[in-house]
Regions:
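Positively charged N-terminal leader segments that act as targeting/secretion signals
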Residues: 1-15
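N-terminal nucleotide-binding beta1-loop-alpha1 segment
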Residues: 15-35, 85
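Conserved beta-loop-beta/alpha segment of the NTase-like Rossmann-fold superfamily
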Residues: 78-149
Length: 255
């Protein structure tokens, strides 16, 4: 249950303040030259940077404990620290390890905590939602040239597992937003403690691979977001589709 503290910030009855971690260390190799001198988090949709929109939504939801894990183009994030009450955690090994390493750096924080990919585009403030279980946002989307992690759910929208899809049809896939509670965090920490070093260095490795262990042992819910409210930037085709969504649904409202 969410309540309000004396300062107006949201917290759960267990005494934990809601917080957020944004993972933004990756290079974004599929964008080639476009990400050579720019982190994907700094791409603009309309006139707003992706990372700024995430931060603004978090602040509007009353979440003040915000950490950004940086790596590629780390120096560019300093301007955000000047303008917003955020913490910066530099993953110095971002070029050597996959994003499992970024997750390991902040896993101790994942108790009543939002976990967000820095390349997740949002047109709606989803951070005002309250969940009783660890919850992963999902969306129907096409792979668009990149493998996607398909979410397997039961009739109650509990996540049962995942598999990789490289086809052309739309599938229910993970969006880069999740809300973590203590039970799932403990399983994740245990899984990370047994992870072999070579798995952290595998180029195509992703922290979502660890979710199989989490969903086996605790209840994790899926929350499907309509495609008009956002998306993630895995490929150039994704970017083009998100721009089209913005132009169709949101451009006239944000003038």
């Amino acid at each position: 249950m969410i309540e309000k503290a004396a300062d107006g910030l949201p917290f759960f009855t267990g005494g934990f303040y809601m917080k957020a971690v944004i993972l933004a260390a990756g290079v974004g190799h599929r964008f080639k030259e476009l990400t050579k001198y720019k982190n994907k988090a700094f791409f603009t949709i309309g006139q707003t940077m992706v990372i700024k929109q995430i931060i603004q939504y978090l602040l509007q939801a009353g979440i003040r404990d915000i950490t950004i894990v940086t790596g590629h183009r780390h120096e560019d994030f300093s301007i955000l620290k000047k303008n917003y009450p955020i913490h910066i955690l530099y993953n110095t090994a971002y070029g050597e390890y996959n994003n499992i390493h970024s997750l390991a750096l902040i896993a101790e924080q994942l108790n009543e905590c939002w976990l967000i990919h820095g390349d997740t585009v949002l047109f709606k403030n989803i951070f005002k939602e309250a969940f009783t279980h660890t919850t992963f946002y999902t969306m129907l989307k096409r792979p668009n040239g990149a493998p996607v992690r398909v979410v397997e759910v039961d009739e109650q929208h509990h996540i049962q597992g995942f598999h990789i899809d490289r086809g052309e049809r739309r599938v229910l896939s993970l969006l880069g937003v999740s809300y973590w509670r203590k039970d799932a965090q403990m399983i994740l920490l245990e899984t990370l403690s047994h992870l072999h070093e070579k798995e952290k260095k595998r180029f195509d490795g992703e922290w979502e691979e660890l979710l199989q262990e989490v969903v086996k042992k605790v209840e994790v819910d899926a929350y499907q977001l309509d495609r008009k409210y956002g998306g993630d930037l895995n490929t150039m085709k994704d970017y083009q589709e998100i721009v089209e969504t913005y132009d169709r649904y949101w451009k006239s409202m944000r003038k």
